[in-house]
């Protein structure tokens, strides 16, 4: 993997900097590195493809070296370099695709394609290394089973989940009380509702709670917490739990009271925030517990218009609702996760779909992320680490 990254980095720099008119002295170090790459690769043969519709291609390396000059690089010099660069780029692209479409239940962190296995040989270590890539650094750590740490802008840690629970229900579904939620990616939205606006609740207050267990531990998380759940702020028709009927939800939004959020690790509270919105920090957690209340305003605090919305007896045409939105803006995770700000999952999925790669023993059909993160096994993590690393290498050359 180190060699593949070094090849890609060298080729990217060469493609960007070996251009007509450039002073040789400005790129002499790069050209020496380029020539070392050519010397190491010359005389070797590789084969890529042969899985799904990815065609088999044979690669032979026999290229001349770039010379020295006291002047600027001319058109002939650049054209010679470009021919070599284009062939090498095509080779790296195919090695990456060949690697991205393969998976293994055992030691999925190790190279799976014949071409990348060959590049891992001792003879290719002479290619100049550049391990500045975060993915490469973490691949090396994961490969040695040492601690890894991945910084993501928006980690897709929550499997998609959209449902509701009813704490009070009737066959007519005309006086309901319960909780709705939508968890996906890096965001949780949860709403508590009571058709009767807590008219018969103790102290005219309804208590709601929403608990989310993460599939992996997050640390040093920057989180936004808002006293609203906009996805549950408009009328809708909802299917009943048994699917035999539908019920009408017509929310009128209240601000939640006594909001408390707890971040827990192995059942122990690590961070606790009460009535605090905006940006908050969670140090280390694998579970999030949100609790909040709906409080019915005293009659003297209701204007006639508000009192008309929430009568003391049925029918209840408007439904009191409170909600919260929790959004993980950034966090550190020791596991490999898809990230809203990166294209690795999209790149891997696109290549696998484009070449009709058959479903293997590790990844679900279509690389369904909800399935992946819901059943996140060590085997899946190893394979994701490898294919995401390769995807990051490929993205240096192929946009």
Swiss-Prot record:
Keywords: Calcium, Capsid protein, Intermediate capsid protein, Metal-binding, Ubl conjugation, Virion, Zinc
Record text on subunit structure and interactions: Homotrimer. Interacts with the inner capsid protein VP2. Interacts with the outer capsid glycoprotein VP7. Interacts with the outer capsid protein VP5*.
Pfam families in the record: Rota_Capsid_VP6
Claim: Calcium is one of the keywords in the record: yes
Protein name: Intermediate capsid protein VP6
Major location (coarse): virion
Note: The VP6 trimer contains a zinc ion located at the center of the molecule. The zinc ion is not essential for either trimerization or transcription activity of the DLP. Zinc-depleted VP6 has an increased sensitivity to proteases.
Segments of this protein annotated with the region Interaction with the inner capsid protein VP2: 62-73
Membrane spanning stretches: none
